[in-house]
Amino acid sequence: MLKSGAIGEIVDVNASVTTLTDEQSEKMDSARFGGSMSENACFPLLPIFKLLGTDYRDVTFYSKMGNGVDLYTKAVFRYDKAVASFQVGLGAKTEGNLVISGTKGYAYVPAPWWKTDYFEIRYEDQNLNKKYFYPFAGEGLRYEIKDFISSVLQGTFQKLSRREIVRMTDVQDCYLKGETVYRI
């Protein structure tokens, strides 16, 4: 639906997955899980890669650190004709929605976007706005997100491609190596 031009050309995708986690949690242990990026980055990468593809030009990270892990990280991707960003946090909270901006309108998926059963297509003229309801099938956050994005794009269910998986690991690797990571 979105790739067919319902919101025009996609120029931006923004997704967030955050939770406030106890500082004593094993998720906050740098030796075990490594913080927000290690715990949650794969989830917001799914809609970004499904909508814009895996051939981004570069990525920059901004992280708030604490106890040796990232409590919050914002990643910004630059594509040839679009940008994308995500926020992940174990020690900071955001709305948790997904917004896909286009040249004619935008798609809004309310928080928590990975569990939602509907999304909205919104335009400058609010009389044209539409809500679409989507019944989830199956279990597992990763599969729900993938199925949701696939159905929005094509009305079909597709598996995560090998290329998408490899590029997700490339993003994690870039972050873990400290490439283009700025501490805030």
Predicted feature locations:
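Active-site loop of classical SDR/Rossmann-like NAD(P)-dependent oxidoreductases
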Residues: 132-146
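C-terminal helix-rich "cap/oligomerization" subdomain common to oxidoreductases
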Residues: 147-184
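Contiguous beta-strand/loop segments that form the cofactor/metal-binding neighborhood of enzyme cores
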Residues: 39-115, 145-156
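Short glycine/proline- and acidic residue-enriched helix-loop micro-motifs
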Residues: 31, 128-132
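Predominantly a Rossmann-like dinucleotide-binding segment in NAD(P)-dependent oxidoreductases
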Residues: 1-59
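Short, hydrophobic secondary-structure boundary micro-motifs
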Residues: 10, 59-60, 131, 159-161, ...
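Short polybasic amphipathic segments
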Residues: 98, 116-126
